[in-house]
Amino acid sequence: MPSIKSDIEIARAAAKKPIFEIGAKLGIPVEQLVPYGHDKAKVSAEFIAGQAGKKDGKLILVTAINPTPAGEGKTTTTVGLGDGLNRIGKKAIVCIREASLGPCFGVKGGAAGGGFAQVVPMEDINLHFTGDFHAITSAHNLLAAMIDNHIYWGNEENIDIRRITWRRVMDMNDRALRSMVSSLGGVANGFPRQGGFDITVASEVMAILCLATDLTDLERRLGDIIIGYRFDRTPVHARDLKADGAMAVLLKDAMQPNLVQTLENNPAFVHGGPFANIAHGCNSVTATKTALKLGDYVVTEAGFGADLGAEKFFDIKCRKAGLKPDAAVIVATVRALKMNGGVKKDDLGTEDVAALKKGCANLGRHVANVRRFGVPVVVAINHFISDTDAEIAAVKEFVSRLGAEAILCRHWALGSAGIEELAHKVVELAESGQAKFQPLYGDDISLFEKIEIVASKIYHAGEVTADKAVRDQLQTWEEQGYGKLPVCMAKTQYSFSTDPSLRGAPEGHIVTVREVRLSAGAGFVVAITGEIMTMPGLPKSPSAERIFLNEQGYIEGLF
């Protein structure tokens, strides 16, 4: 039996075309592309502005059920579907997020797809790429430095150092930095205070970059950032410290979407990268809107399960950007359904139809949740070698009882040839006119009510609890004019509840909101639930231990 090639081996053997040829497919002139080598480029702001009057293509969201730690192939399916649509004659563009170094060296691995459904250059995309994350980290930490510098030189804004909310960031999983004391070592180093680090993908600057429509909007949003509060409890904004202009300068190039290609030489935008469990989990509005002007179909993904990424895609990204999705694909795997049915991780390769049927309750809830937003749904069964015919048949039968269709997809092994059936179904749904998109809640209800609606309608929680301090903080923000903002739930990705071990489709559980953060620049309120951390830690045996350069200087073990 021939050995199965790793993702990195497949990507390395790709017959890539020069990036200018990929741009030409979309009608992007050579002079409007800023090349980063031969296989990746940024699209100029001038070109993007010139597309404003064009008609939009169809927008397709790819989401998933609650995943196993390794993920269920959502990005792989997004890339495969883009290739599949091109294969059947549609002009399709893939829009995905950039990879964070945290999961790359942690537990999940890369974020460029897998098998024969990848975007390339895979190694670059998973590592430093075009430097966007560096720019975001630098802009975020510039503001942090300017806060402490302002206090050191007299604190003209009367910032209460006990109420500084702006933390520092880095693009790495490092639990040791979650809580720290800075400015120790004497008067020359400033005023000691407690702070900490978040991972870059949880940064409000990341969210701002992904939601801003142009450089003017970017700078306005950066200025709106609240870094803390004065002694009189009034908010201090980044523009009060004159930091917004310099931050925008650092982000000027990062605002331009990155163009790359799939293994089948189809165009893909890879831009922005907020996590969906601790941020809003969607690629940039700029990339999505640009792709909609250039293609007949745009296939994008939102992180983790539909309870997180899809809800935020609909309630934050689509609401803020005026987007109206035409269809949604929910990725399910036999192994994840069995895990949601109670099967242990080590036993997922063994046939267990009974457990799978039990776990299908998780899939059923995700289908119902997406339909709640008025978007038609198809289920993609991402095929794994260990799947049996009986298990696949059980999934198809379950989904058919929901009035939807489940389609077996083999894009990981076969590329676009393995996903043609799904591509045809997506076209059918998108062209049917069934989509009647609407957000889950209106702007005018209270912030706590918005949290309760997401928890009850999407998570099926019986109750939302929060300390008086949390409720009072939400009320204060409402009084300050932030009551119309949507909420961004920070929650475990492994369950509908806040308990990662509670699988399936739990009912009546309690969602505890332990902290809330106002992202005034991004335009949402983050509600942190359960034990979720905005700075992850590395697992006992991180992926980094298995990544190295071989004797030829090639990267091994990345994915």
UniProtKB/Swiss-Prot annotation:
Reaction(s) catalysed (UniProt annotation): (6S)-5,6,7,8-tetrahydrofolate + formate + ATP = (6R)-10-formyltetrahydrofolate + ADP + phosphate
EC number: 6.3.4.3
Residues annotated to bind ATP: 68-75
Domain of life: Bacteria
GO biological process, alphabetically ordered: tetrahydrofolate interconversion
InterPro entries for this protein: Formate_THF_ligase, Formate_THF_ligase_CS, P-loop_NTPase
GO MF annotation: an example: ATP binding
Transmembrane segments: none
Pathway in which the depicted protein is active: One-carbon metabolism; tetrahydrofolate interconversion
Principal EC category: ligase
Keyword annotations of the record: ATP-binding, Ligase, Nucleotide-binding, One-carbon metabolism
Family, as annotated: Belongs to the formate--tetrahydrofolate ligase family.
Protein's recorded name: Formate--tetrahydrofolate ligase
Species for this entry: Rhizobium leguminosarum bv. trifolii (strain WSM2304)
